[in-house]
């Protein structure tokens, strides 16, 4: 047994059990989505950096969300594309651990950033006269750093619990990336502590932040209904709708994965939900939350106009 435990240093990601033609089709589609993700979020980062009119708390947090979305895609998609072309290409033990750690880090960070963005919107709509006094740059930087730091620290806990586990079972991971629960199934030791920590982290990451978001939006809705100007009211509703779409995509997939009903093959369901979460969410977020914003669109038009003139 000891020899088996120490001999496994590489693992195979089985990905999608489809034929070669479907694999090539998926490779083309996922490559296209990956490019759109990098292009959309990269555009948001570039526009916010270039235009001083976008140097405001709202766009500061949007830029961090764009960074998380790029990181999400870069952590999972390149390896997934390699596996579609070369299904037998293994991933190293260190690579597996790093991918698991980074995915958890980005998930927790995005969860907290969505809470911070909801709070920023709450202050902007419910306390507009005090907005600049409350959302100072010091507060904004503190909130962003706290989100990233919490994501790293919570993921380190999972990593510390995962590293000592021996792996002596067949080194095949039935997933398109090293998702922590899929990795735990390969361990030949008791993993109840690890699984309970993952469950506790998922529940606390859903219930606490989502409750805060719901309370924030209830206050926001009450404040919007009291606005006299129809134009201001419409603009506030549009901003809230964009944010709620992003929140719905993130928390919707997470809730279905962890607390939703199971039909058919739960493992396959979870795998495809995680695909949506790590590939489609990052691609859709800039379209929903940023590129529909009038100030961002105006900046994009100005940049494109300058490029055409040159």
From Swiss-Prot:
Belongs to the G-protein coupled receptor 1 family. Odorant receptor. It is found in: Cell membrane. The chain crosses the membrane at residues 25-48, 57-78, 100-119, 139-157, 195-218, 236-258, 272-291. Glycans are attached at residue 4. GO terms for biological process: detection of chemical stimulus involved in sensory perception of smell. It comes from the Eukaryota. Its main location: membrane. Residues 1-24, 79-99, 158-194, 259-271 are extracellular. This is Olfactory receptor 2A7. Signal peptide: none annotated. GO terms for cellular component: membrane; plasma membrane.
């Amino acid at each position: 047994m000891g020899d088996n435990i120490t001999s496994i240093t590489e693992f195979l990601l089985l990905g999608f059990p489809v034929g070669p033609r479907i694999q090539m089709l998926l490779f083309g589609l996922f490559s296209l989505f990956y490019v759109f993700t990098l292009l959309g979020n990269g555009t948001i980062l570039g526009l916010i950096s270039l235009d001083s009119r976008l140097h405001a708390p709202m766009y500061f947090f949007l830029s961090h969300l764009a960074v998380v979305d790029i990181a999400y895609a870069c952590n999972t998609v390149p390896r997934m594309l390699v596996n579609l072309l070369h299904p037998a290409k293994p991933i190293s033990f260190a690579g597996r651990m790093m991918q698991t750690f980074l995915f958890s880090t980005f998930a927790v960070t995005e969860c907290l950033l969505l809470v911070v963005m909801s709070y920023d919107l709450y202050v902007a709509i419910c306390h507009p006269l005090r907005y600049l006094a409350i959302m100072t740059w010091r507060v904004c930087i503190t909130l962003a750093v706290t989100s990233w730091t919490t994501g790293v620290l919570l993921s380190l806990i999972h990593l510390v619990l995962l590293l000592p586990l021996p792996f002596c079972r067949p080194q095949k991971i039935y997933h398109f990336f090293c998702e922590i629960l899929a990795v735990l199934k390969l361990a030949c030791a008791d993993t109840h502590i690890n699984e309970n920590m993952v469950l506790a982290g998922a529940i606390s990451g859903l219930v606490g932040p989502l409750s805060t978001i719901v309370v924030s939006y209830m206050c926001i809705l009450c404040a919007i209904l009291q606005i006299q100007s129809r134009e201001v009211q419409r603009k506030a509703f549009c901003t809230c709708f964009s944010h709620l779409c992003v929140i719905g995509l993130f928390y919707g997939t997470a809730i279905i994965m962890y607390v939703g009903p199971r039909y058919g093959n739960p493992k396959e369901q979870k795998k495809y939900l995680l695909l949506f979460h790590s590939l489609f969410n990052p691609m859709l977020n800039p379209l929903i939350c940023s590129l529909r914003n009038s100030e961002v669109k105006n900046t994009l038009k100005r940049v494109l106009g300058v490029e055409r003139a040159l």
